[in-house]
Design a protein with these regions (language model features):
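Active-site His/acidic residue clusters
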Residues: 317, 343-384, 388
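Alpha-helical membrane-embedded segments
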Residues: 105-109, 174-195
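Active-site-proximal alpha/beta segments of enzymes that process anionic O-linked groups
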Residues: 105-137, 216-217, 227-350, 453-455, ...
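Metal-dependent active-site segment of extracytoplasmic phospho-/sulfohydrolases and closely related
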Residues: 221-224, 228, 240, 381-423, ...
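Active-site rim elements
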Residues: 285, 415-416, 438-447, 463
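Phosphate/adenylate-binding glycine loop and adjacent helical scaffold
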Residues: 482-497
Length: 497
């Protein structure tokens, strides 16, 4: 007898949140610097007052580099404040800086890239032989962005070392203040004038006039292949998904949001709006649950049911609407377990909206890289599993009135499959719709955004829009009513014959 997939335990949910503190670059920097400073304090005579004063002096820099990421190309500007700090305070204790660098290499390459991935998803103990190269290419918003994190924590340790070693630390207050104010002004100007690649947001709320008078579908099923890079899907041996594309409507320039992090993207997909409104701005969610109405809320008010079958991180955004699975599973079998359990959950709950998140492609990109054969192999496996799930739905008779959507929440970059800052491979995601109410063989070339997912589900199921939805309904994918009625009748007649 097959074992059903475990739900995410309470421990896993808490552990996932703790891991995000170290995984998200914004929170990692102050935590890492504080940890290194504490170890330095332990081996240098326990100068308690100097230790705490050093941390107090660092608070403005902690805040500045939490607010301002210096994403992608902007990260090279981080070396300028570091150079100024060395000019102001002199060459610091090189032992401290070398220790910090060594611990960072240990954390990224060996703890995260090897031990963590081996224990959680079963990668080889020799993963460090590849992943160190991937970290050097990485440009995402995590702690694994070497050339973003390195100048940040070195700058802060230069300041800490100067204060800690000073005979009169208070005498350095003016220099630290000048550096902090200068760093803030510099960061503000760099981001204000050079950070210009964020997706353009829809300025107005979705027009309710775009909703059809009657529901177009009885059910909507959304399969999210987490972290599936668009061009790699097109290159992969994925015959079923490629057939769905030919027989449905494909959006060639479907754009994710910024920052392109999983919880942030899912929040935008199913509320129809942006992080500034729904409140989920990274995978590290300090204030739980989206702050606006989601498609799940809308369905519940109308006596319908929506379920998101996903990883524990998504509970932080959608709470009880999430049926969670454990992400602690060998990567070669995790998607198979997910799709087997998806059938059980769908059969038991009979939802009007069913969303399932597949994670093996994303995890392979993170642990082994997106430009290697393993990534294409995982897409091939996802294709077979989705084909099996689709056939199962068809055998139940559900596909006669179901809209079937396949998409990714974000792509993945060339390093450790990074995503967040919208580097090459992250920005545009695969997105296509299939079903009796969906146009066949159509390609939409115009820019669209994943914030259109929730409004489009509203249109398909005949329910109101979420209250802050901004994405336009993807109505160009819908067949005209007369065409749909004729083709449905022909389809049913053919089945009888």
């Amino acid at each position: 007898m097959r074992k059903s997939m475990k739900q995410a335990s309470a421990f896993e949910i808490i552990a996932a949140r703790c891991w995000n503190v170290l995984n998200e670059g914004k929170s990692f920097t102050p935590v890492y610097v504080t940890g290194i400073a504490f170890l330095y304090y332990l081996v240098t005579g326990w100068q308690t007052s100097a230790f705490f004063l050093g941390l107090v002096y660092l608070l403005p820099l902690f805040v500045i580099y939490y607010v301002y990421d210096f994403p992608l190309h902007l990260r090279w500007f981080l070396w300028i404040p570091l150079g100024i700090a060395i000019y102001l305070f002199g060459i610091p204790d090189m032992g401290l800086l070398l220790f910090a660098l060594g611990m960072y290499i240990f954390f990224t390459v060996f703890f995260w890239g090897t031990l963590y991935y081996h224990l959680r998803i079963g990668t080889t103990w020799w993963n460090f032989l590849r992943i160190w190269k991937l970290f050097l290419k990485n440009t995402d918003s995590t702690s694994g962005n070497v050339f973003e994190q390195l100048p940040k924590f070195l700058l802060q340790l230069v300041v800490f070392s100067a204060v800690y070693e000073a005979v009169q630390p208070v005498a350095l207050l003016s220099e630290v203040s000048i550096l902090s104010v200068g760093a803030f002004i510099f960061a503000f100007l760099v981001h204000r004038y050079l950070f210009n690649w964020k997706p353009v947001e829809y300025p107005a709320y979705t027009n309710s006039a775009d909703l059809p008078a009657e529901p177009l579908a009885k059910k909507v099923v959304v399969v999210v292949i987490d972290g599936c890079r668009k061009e790699r899907l097109y290159e992969a041996d994925a015959p079923f998904l490629h057939r769905l594309m030919r027989q449905g409507t494909v959006y060639e320039t479907m754009e994710t949001i910024y920052p392109a992090r999983t919880v942030t993207c899912f929040s935008s997909m199913f509320t129809g709006t942006y992080p500034r409104e729904h409140g989920i701005k990274s995978n590290m969610v300090w204030d739980l649950l989206v702050k606006v109405e989601s498609i799940f809320d809308v369905l519940k008010k109308r006596g319908k049911k929506g379920i998101l079958f996903g990883c524990a991180h998504l509970i932080d955004a959608f709470g009880d609407y999430v049926e969670s699975f454990t992400a602690v599973s060998h990567n070669d079998v995790v998607d198979k377990k997910i799709m087997e359990q998806a059938k059980v959950l769908y059969d038991r709950e009979n939802p009007d909206l069913f969303i399932v998140q597949m994670i093996a492609v994303d995890q392979t990109g993170h642990s082994r890289g997106v430009l290697y054969p393993e990534y294409l192999e995982k897409i091939k496996e996802a294709d077979a599993l989705i084909a099996d799930f689709y056939a199962w739905l068809t055998a139940r008779g559900d596909m006669d009135e179901t809209a079937f959507i396949v998409m990714a929440d974000h792509g993945q970059g060339n390093g450790i499959g990074g995503h967040g800052h919208l580097d090459t491979g992250e920005r545009f995601v695969p997105f296509f719709m299939h079903g009796p109410m969906i146009e066949c063989g159509k390609k939409v070339e115009e820019f669209r955004s994943i914030v259109s997912v929730a409004p489009t589900i509203s249109a398909l199921l005949g329910v109101p829009l979420p209250d802050h939805a901004r994405g336009p309904v993807l109505k160009e994918a819908f067949k005209q009513k007369e065409q749909t009625s004729y083709e449905e009748a022909d389809h049913r007649y053919s089945r009888v014959q």
